[in-house]
Amino acid sequence: MLNYIYNHSPIIFQNLMVSIKGKIFMKQRYTKHYYEEIKRLRECNDLFELQNQRFEEFYNYIKKNSEFYSEIIKKNNLSGKKITVANINQLPEITKDDIRKNVDKIITKKKNKLIKMGTGGSTGKSMVFYTNAYDMSRKIAYLDYFKEQHGVYKGMKRVSVGGRKIVPIKQKKKVFWRYNKPLNQLMISAYHADGENLKYYIKKLNKFQPETLDGYTTVIHRIARYILDNNIELSFTPIAIFPNAETLTDLMRDDIEKAFNCPVRNQYASSEGAPFITENKEGELEINVATGVFECKQIHGNIYELIVTGFYTTTTPLLRYKIGDSVELENELPVNYQQKDIKIKRIIGRNNDFLQSREKGIVTNVNLSTAIRFVENDVIESQFVQNDIDNIIVYLVISNDADKNNIIKKLKYELKFRFGTNTNFHFEFVNKIPSTPGGKKRFAINNIK
């Protein structure tokens, strides 16, 4: 009902609705826990000691309050064993499938006291998880602490680009943004940032004069390329730009820094609560041990798969979570490595396969995964295959009690935002998604020559 009212309201009223939602987010995120966390981070002199303390608190809490983890600990005869950061590998790893299938047993509080969240993930598997004001507040505190290291502070003029559908599909006006007044945040649409629309985005940026930008890497890069290709001079200079959700390449960084004349600072986390990897003032990537524990499983040479434990996930705990992302380290790790030995050279993430649209251009894994999010746990696995520009086959593995027609209806609606109205979608329900010879399952396959 609220979506219907929003979509049929004047833009000025939509701005008001966005600001009301922003006020609600502020109450959820800027609690006493936010201020306690950011104070502790600012004053901490030994982050590794803080990590040890936090792991002990986190482990004892979920052992007591999560039925799922309590059973795992007993099953592995670890009830009387003291588990620390140093011997965390005695615990079994968990996967996204484990969370998807057991979320009701994993959560540490009653559902009616939690906030329901979702992620499609760039593997194409949808997942529902839960959080609360305590976890959200501390996570936002860390993000703000990270930005403070680069001169950006809470309340500064900010432009954000993300997956929210802030522009109704039938809107004709070239107004691709909405203003969230409580957060002093201009939210710009990721779904319309292409072609000649980009000149309207840049005109608005010059008018708004943001002090910082954050959000989808590919969209920020697309705007930067338009600025460079058309020799546009901006009337503002941001303090720093913080791309997220997608892999940042060296070429993208160079283009963005040149277009906006400011530093780009990379970051890595996940919507479900993985600990942070962030870039310091010297341009080096650092694991942030105050936010969790990082384990690295060697794939080849200096390439390692990440296994993570997130301290900001007390509601849906992530303990030795196989997140499915990889990093390149500066050096190979010794067998009995410690947290301080992990020196990250590059965040690899997942393969950034992309699809194409005549109307929208490149559609990335992140764009597709946000569509899958809207069908929650009904979709177990998914895969998008494109053999020509106007047709996409969508393979879906669904739960036994899922409504196929409802899934198709929801996905068609979401995908129109990402591809436009001229792309045809062909849905096929299958028992499994085939693996590659290397054992991987690809989320997006582009066969266009």
From Swiss-Prot:
GO biological process, one term: capsule polysaccharide biosynthetic process
UniProt keyword Membrane present: no
Entry keywords, A to Z: Capsule biogenesis/degradation, Exopolysaccharide synthesis
Organism superkingdom: Bacteria
Pathway: Capsule biogenesis; capsule polysaccharide biosynthesis
Stored InterPro entries: ANL_N_sf, CapK_Type1_Caps_Biosynth
Chain's role: Required for the biosynthesis of type 1 capsular polysaccharide.
PANTHER family, sorted: CAPSULAR POLYSACCHARIDE BIOSYNTHESIS PROTEIN
Name of protein: Protein CapK
Species of provenance: Staphylococcus aureus
